[in-house]
Amino acid sequence: MAAAAQAPAAAKVVVSTSPRAGGGGGGGGDRKVVPVVVAAAAGDEAQSEMHVLAVDDSSVDRAVIAKILRSSKYRVTTVESATRALELLCLGLVPNVNMIITDYWMPGMTGYELLKRVKESSQLKEIPVVIMSSENVPNRISRCLEEGAEDFLLKPVRPSDVSRLCSRIR
């Protein structure tokens, strides 16, 4: 019953690891090559419709959300940290993102901090951000929604959660 799977496209990009977000002029700063995985949707026409950036430090959770999104015919880029997601978004290395789905609790920068940075950015503020968490903490959920999160999903994320979100965001 499984359709022919398309292998995710792997790319490597160079990003700045300097502590200043957005850079400035100059140069300087350390740079490193980082892997980015873009999983294509099954239908060619669907690929251009919806592109989701999935951010989670758990490789299992990244794989689950990517599989659910691909089964719904969306293109998915996965990254393992909010810091990496923000770098790629600010550098324009993940073009045409229609939605960001991020875990709340990650080392370094949390999903909540990513949400705040996205909403403060004139370039990125229109991108809907959805927060996911395995912890049902009402104050945390309220705080994320007040900061502009499109939704807050409890893990494990189900295909029906993704369908509901994507139909609202198109």
Swiss-Prot record:
Keywords tagged on the record: Cytokinin signaling pathway, Phosphoprotein, Transcription, Transcription regulation, Two-component regulatory system
Keyword Nuclease: no
Induction behaviour: By cytokinin and salt stress.
Nucleotide-binding among keywords: no
SMART domains linked: REC (SM00448)
GO BP terms in the entry: cytokinin-activated signaling pathway; phosphorelay signal transduction system
PROSITE patterns: RESPONSE_REGULATORY (PS50110)
4-aspartylphosphate sites (modified residues): D103
Residues in Response regulatory domain copies: 51-170
Tissue occurrence: Expressed in mature leaves and flowers, and at low levels in roots and shoots.
Domain of life: Eukaryota
Gene3D superfamilies with a match to the protein in the record: 3.40.50.2300
PTM notes: Two-component system major event consists of a His-to-Asp phosphorelay between a sensor histidine kinase (HK) and a response regulator (RR). In plants, the His-to-Asp phosphorelay involves an additional intermediate named Histidine-containing phosphotransfer protein (HPt). This multistep phosphorelay consists of a His-Asp-His-Asp sequential transfer of a phosphate group between first a His and an Asp of the HK protein, followed by the transfer to a conserved His of the HPt protein and finally the transfer to an Asp in the receiver domain of the RR protein.
Pfam family, one: Response_reg
Stored PANTHER family: TWO-COMPONENT RESPONSE REGULATOR, TWO-COMPONENT RESPONSE REGULATOR ORR6
Protein task: Functions as a response regulator involved in His-to-Asp phosphorelay signal transduction system. Phosphorylation of the Asp residue in the receiver domain activates the ability of the protein to promote the transcription of target genes. Type-A response regulators seem to act as negative regulators of the cytokinin signaling.
Family membership: Belongs to the ARR family. Type-A subfamily.
UniProt name for this protein: Two-component response regulator ORR6
Native source species: Oryza sativa subsp. indica
Gene symbol of the encoding locus: RR6
